[in-house]
């Protein structure tokens, strides 16, 4: 029995959008005890202060529903030293993915236009398909994957999209769109909600948040998380920043207690330990310089952007190399079925020691043949 027959034999039937869509599933199993350079996570884990805060959670905290005011207050006052936020301009979510899904649930309409780039983070597409939206994409330009700003402007004016998603820096190309360019895009059509996914922003330091005034620019939402820098990917904590009325509508489609008490406690401890995050980001950026210098003289294509990852087009079949790297203790991500970057692998950047291990292994497997 094929998938179509299986669905037709179901009672009740799921929505037709669900039947027709492909699920987003990342191959994240059996990754323990390996050097994880495949999903752009923090490769060291959270700070000692996070461990201590979680260890000190008492049973009473587990048995009652989580409270968010303390974390929201801290984020309001200390997330960026250069500015403060109104607590109503902040949404807390069970990871950035939950924030993305909630935005589509609250603003995505059937047959409305969803505009994004290609290639980009794969979770945007299924979220738009669930809502029955029409997806339009702009392709990155040239070998350096420059942002297609002119294409984007033309499509905003022509199609007046309901939702626009820009991953900035983009995953997987690392392309960066500057803050002033984003604000200009928002001004082209104020009925378009522009969502800026800034999960990797700390690695290049060009966030909208220090400069944007949500009272003046109401059609921008900024998403961040603590997965890539603070090492909290397993606890799932994400933030959405925007005009208070926009955040209020997004919150309507989430559960009242979606973020658990462990995540709240860990997030507060991580945000208070800013030096740990700063030191980790600094170490990753030093490791980027190290691996860039190693790869520079090689006659193979490679691309570094603004995130904690890079692309490389190996001599070997990327599927074979990915498997062999795993057999040697290192996970990397094959970029199959992704426009303009097929036959490449994406490599997360860890510490200098970790990238030296990557280099030794990669050289042995792909260059010494």
Which positions does each model-derived feature cover?
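Conserved PLP-binding catalytic core of the aspartate aminotransferase-like
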Residues: 285, 297-328
């Amino acid at each position: 029995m094929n998938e179509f027959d299986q669905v037709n034999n179901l009672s009740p039937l799921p929505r037709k959008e669900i039947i027709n869509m492909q699920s987003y599933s990342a191959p994240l199993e059996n990754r323990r005890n390996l050097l994880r350079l495949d999903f752009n996570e923090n490769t060291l884990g959270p700070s000692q202060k996070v461990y201590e805060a979680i260890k000190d959670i008492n049973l009473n905290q587990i048995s009652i529903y989580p409270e968010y005011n303390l974390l929201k207050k801290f984020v309001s006052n200390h997330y960026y030293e250069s500015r403060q936020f109104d607590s109503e301009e902040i949404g807390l979510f069970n990871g950035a993915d939950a924030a993305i899904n909630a935005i589509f649930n609250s603003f995505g309409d059937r047959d409305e236009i969803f505009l994004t780039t290609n290639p980009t983070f794969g979770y945007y597409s299924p979220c738009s398909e669930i809502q029955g939206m029409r997806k339009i994409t702009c392709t990155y330009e040239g070998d350096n994957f420059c942002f297609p700003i002119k294409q984007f402007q033309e499509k905003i004016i022509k199609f007046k999209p309901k939702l626009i998603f820009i991953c900035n820096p983009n995953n997987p190309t690392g392309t960066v769109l500057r803050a002033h360019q984003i604000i200009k895009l928002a001004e082209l059509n104020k009925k378009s909600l522009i969502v800026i996914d800034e999960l990797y922003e700390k690695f290049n330091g060009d966030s909208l948040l220090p400069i944007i005034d949500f009272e003046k620019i109401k059609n921008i939402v900024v998403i961040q998380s603590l997965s890539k820098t603070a090492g909290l990917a397993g606890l799932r904590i994400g933030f959405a920043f925007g005009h208070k009325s926009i955040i209020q509508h997004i919150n309507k489609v989430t559960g009242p207690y979606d973020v658990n008490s462990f995540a709240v406690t860990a997030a507060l401890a991580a945000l208070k330990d800013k030096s740990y995050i700063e030191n980790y980001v600094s170490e990753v950026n030093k490791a980027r310089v190290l691996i860039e210098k190693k790869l520079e003289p090689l006659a193979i294509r490679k691309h570094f952007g603004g995130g904690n990852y890079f692309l490389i087009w190996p001599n070997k079949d990327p599927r074979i190399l990915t498997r062999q790297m795993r057999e040697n203790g290192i996970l990397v991500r094959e970029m199959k079925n992704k426009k303009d970057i097929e036959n490449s692998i994406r490599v997360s950047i860890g510490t200098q020691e970790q990238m030296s291990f990557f280099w030794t292994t990669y050289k042995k497997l792909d260059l010494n043949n």
